[in-house]
Design a protein with these regions (language model features):
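Metal-associated gating/positioning segment near the N- to mid-region
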Residues: 17-87, 104
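Histidine-rich, glycine-flanked metal-binding segment
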Residues: 1-24
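His/Asp/Glu-enriched, well-ordered alpha-helical/loop segment
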Residues: 176-202, 254, 281-282, 288-324
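Histidine/acidic-residue-rich, glycine-tolerant segments that coordinate divalent metal ions
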Residues: 67-78, 83-200, 214, 238-248
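A conserved active-site cap/scaffold subdomain adjacent to cofactor or substrate pockets
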Residues: 193, 201-204, 214, 251-283
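Glycine- and other small-residue-rich loops at beta-strand/loop junctions that grip anionic moieties
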Residues: 38, 128-131, 152, 183-187, ...
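Hydrophobic faces of well-ordered beta-strands that scaffold small-molecule active sites
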Residues: 25-31, 61-63, 92-96, 118-122, ...
Length: 324
């Protein structure tokens, strides 16, 4: 908004920024604060998480109001707003994560838009969160009518279950088994399938936390046929790689997240995607857990390690240092 055209009025307070770089406040469009994942509760709530964000210049976050099974979207939004009550030190907003779909939920989407929720997240993995392809198709149609944007966690949940079963039968229980349960094709297949569904509906969509070259190739093919696809990746996929799953003494559990860390080749492809404008946003997917009291729950079984790593504080410095 242009308030006034003319000479700048004398300031009441002047900060000397000589030799410094001035940025607008950064936005982290993908965080998970005060969230019960079904396995553990995240270590950060909205108080500690937003304070950490501000330390390095993130002044706005967008978290997820996640619907529990059997819960209405209205109740879910109220619950998540209650979590933020008098706790947030920075600006915040919500995407709505839809985990169940029926006519009642469908009827609530207009109320969500009137409440300021115009973006929605769906999961293709995690039994307590994921939806089938038919529900994804119906939600995309409803979102199109409302002018909303749908983002999706693209991993093939059925194949993850099959791989995990095989690994456990082979007595592979260390953190190294986690990336083996989610090879790059697990992401690429889900991205390709989701984009085909979106093509049928003719609606813009958002791919969250892209981690693989194969996934980026699927997105390129979709764009060539005219689809509008917005893409997010995260610092962990740009700066960390799969070698960290070979650390000793359970240290690799610190890097158990989904999608998992990938190869150097995948890293290079993602950086190229950023340079070419194929990836629009770098968010954190901040989902922090305490190593001693939470990650170590899975010391004898990798499937019990809470998935997620932090990032809400360090993203600006990391991306400026390695990406500018």
């Amino acid at each position: 908004v242009i308030k006034k055209i003319g000479k700048i009025d004398k300031a009441d307070h002047i900060l000397d920024a000589s030799g410094m770089i001035l940025f607008p406040g950064f936005i982290d469009a993908h965080t998970h604060l005060d969230m019960d994942t079904g396995m553990a509760h995240t270590a950060d709530d909205f108080e500690s998480g937003t304070k950490a964000a501000l330390i390095q210049g993130t002044t706005s976050i967008i978290d997820f109001a996640t619907q529990n099974k059997g819960e209405t979207l209205i109740n879910a939004l109220e619950n998540w707003r209650h979590k933020t009550n008098k706790k947030c030190s920075c600006d915040y907003g919500f995407h709505m994560a839809i985990t169940e779909w029926n006519n009642e939920i469908k009827s609530e989407l207009l109320t969500m838009r009137e409440s300021g929720i115009t973006s929605f997240k769906l999961y293709m993995a995690y039994d307590n969160l994921r939806l089938d392809d038919g529900a994804i198709y119906e939600i995309l149609k409803s979102a199109k009518n409302l002018g909303g944007l749908v983002g999706v966690h693209c991993e093939n949940g059925d194949l993850i279950k099959a791989y995990t079963k095989m690994l456990l039968e082979q007595e592979q229980r260390t953190p190294l088994a986690h990336p083996l349960s989610r090879p790059d094709m697990i992401e690429a297949e889900a991205i390709s399938r989701f984009l085909d569904i979106a093509y049928m509906v003719d609606v813009p969509v958002h791919i969250v936390h892209l981690s693989t070259q194969k996934g980026l190739e699927c997105i390129r093919r979709a764009r060539k046929r005219g689809q509008r696809v917005y893409v997010e990746t995260c610092p962990q996929y740009l700066l960390l790689d799969e070698k960290l799953y070979h650390l000793k003494q359970f240290e690799s559990a610190k890097y158990v997240l989904s999608p998992p860390l990938r190869s150097k080749q995948d890293q290079e492809a993602l950086w190229e995607g950023i340079q070419e404008g194929e990836i629009q946003t770098i968010s954190t997917d901040h989902c922090a857990f305490n190593f001693e009291s939470q990650k170590k729950i899975g010391i004898d079984d990798f499937t019990q390690i809470p998935n997620g790593i932090p990032g809400i504080e360090h993203r600006p410095q990391l991306i400026y240092s390695y990406g500018v």
